[in-house]
């Protein structure tokens, strides 16, 4: 099976392929979550990637996207050593400050692996969303 991965470099560093989501579009998506959950998640991941550059932790929100964040080590190939995987609903609630990182650890469908995975909790909540 021949698989190809597309990585686009935006502002010298980006793991998310595709067009940047504007502040207006991201904010509108957050206000209309049922219809726009994919755009809302991608917008929030984009903000985390821009504000918390690095490669120590991979933050995944399947099926919508994943970014590497937090300064420190850089991971380039294979399974990352520190992974946080959240459901879209839990991810958005964390970003908006509606739940705490500790509460997110108890939610079904969320997983945390690696000794530095907890560093990702420092990005929540996101200001201005």
Task: Set out the residue ranges of the language-model regions.
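A glycine-rich beta-turn/hairpin centered on an aromatic-Pro dipeptide
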Residues: 36-58
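N-terminal amphipathic/basic helix or basic patch
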Residues: 21, 28, 32-39, 43
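Surface loops and adjacent helix of pleckstrin homology
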Residues: 71-72, 115
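Short, charged/polar surface micro-motifs in flexible loops or helix N-caps
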Residues: 64-67, 73-75
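C-terminal interaction segments
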Residues: 2, 6-30, 81-129
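Active-site regions of enzymes building and remodeling cell-envelope glycoconjugates
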Residues: 72-83
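Short connector loops at helix/strand junctions that flank enzyme active sites
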Residues: 52-56, 79, 86-87
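Solvent-exposed beta-strand sheet faces enriched in polar/charged residues
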Residues: 60-62, 113
């Amino acid at each position: 099976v021949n698989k190809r991965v597309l990585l686009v470099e935006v502002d010298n560093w980006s793991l998310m392929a595709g067009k940047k989501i504007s502040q207006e579009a991201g904010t509108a998506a957050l206000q209309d979550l049922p219809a726009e959950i994919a755009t809302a998640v991608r917008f929030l991941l984009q903000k985390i990637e821009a504000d918390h550059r690095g490669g120590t932790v991979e933050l995944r929100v399947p099926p919508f996207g994943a970014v590497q964040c937090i300064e420190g080590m850089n991971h380039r190939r294979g399974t990352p050593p520190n992974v946080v995987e959240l459901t879209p609903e839990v991810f958005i609630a964390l970003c908006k400050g509606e739940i705490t990182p500790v509460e997110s650890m108890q939610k079904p469908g969320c997983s945390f692996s690696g000794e530095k995975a907890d560093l990702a909790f420092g990005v929540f909540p996101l200001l201005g969303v």
